[in-house]
Amino acid sequence: MDNAPAFTAVLFGLRGCLVQAANGTPSPAPGALATLASLRQRQVPCIWLDDLDAPQSKRLAHVLPAWLPGHSVNGVRWPAPNACWQALMALDSERLDGCVLVSGDPRLLQSGLNAGLWTVGLAACSPFCDRSSRQWQALTPQEQDLARGKATLELFSLGVHSVIDHLEALDNCLQDIAQRRRKGEKP
């Protein structure tokens, strides 16, 4: 098999991953719109997930493309796999093989692992490395690098399959996962 099958779906955490709220005003995270456009061009279904109630989630998601569906957790909370499976059902996904979850939220990443998905941790938006805090802004570049390194280690200790600093690196990460799938690796 020369090429790994196309990705079945990519699930994203909403808060911190796709949307940042600076001073209470939501805006797309750096690289979010380009990443979503690239996946859409390749016809990879995408959906966002969040554990906020639906009105709060929709308020944040209004800065994202209208074509992007979302799923707010109903019932069983993360890290149970239910939300990931429900999001995949909302996309009419027929299989788990080739599904990827991207987030900096450890509970959502654990949910993805429990659901049998490939998982990509976002170090810069994980709680271990909170970019929106005043403390983060006060750090020197070296201290920020150390914090990102610690966040990377914390995310890998959860069991995630890959860790990237930001969404701009997702395309290369997906290529790496495709290579791993080509070799027969499973999540």
Q: What would you call each of these model-derived segments?
A:
Residues 1-44, 49, 54, 61-100, ...:
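Asp-based, Mg2+/Mn2+-dependent phosphohydrolase catalytic module
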